[in-house]
Amino acid sequence: ACAHLCKEADLKTALEACKAADSFNFKTFFHTLGFASKXXDDVKKXXXVLDQDASGFLEVEELKLFLQNFCPKXXXLTDAETKAFLKAGDADGDGMLGLDEFAVLVKQ
């Protein structure tokens, strides 16, 4: 669903780097894909694609399946990875990432 937002070689490198359990690092992942240099509107579009239920937020289950949006064969994030990902971006502490929070997280 999100593979079209980045170069195939960059995606392969990013997915390979987080193949092992508990190896996902959102900063490294987004940097490898070049998301940090994209316009905020483009980043929000990516988050809207990740927002499977169109709630305007990325909830825990959507974050857990984050990598599968880039490659269906990718593993789900572990509970620890999901929790760290959420904690890093959840500025208002509501237990979800809003699209604005996601955009800020990607740009870190």
Curated annotation (Swiss-Prot):
Matches recorded under InterPro entries: EF-hand-dom_pair (IPR011992), EF_Hand_1_Ca_BS (IPR018247), EF_hand_dom (IPR002048), Parvalbumin (IPR008080)
Keywords, ordered alphabetically: Acetylation, Allergen, Calcium, Metal-binding, Muscle protein, Repeat
Residues involved in Ca(2+) 2 binding: 90, 92, 94, 96, 101
Signal sequence annotation: none
Family per record: Belongs to the parvalbumin family.
EF-hand domain span: 38-73, 77-108
Purpose: In muscle, parvalbumin is thought to be involved in relaxation after contraction. It binds two calcium ions.
Protein name: Parvalbumin beta 1
Recorded superkingdom: Eukaryota
Residues bearing PTM N-acetylalanine: 1
GO CC term, one of those recorded: sarcoplasm
GO molecular function: calcium ion binding
Binding site for Ca(2+) 1: 51, 53, 55, 57, 59, 62
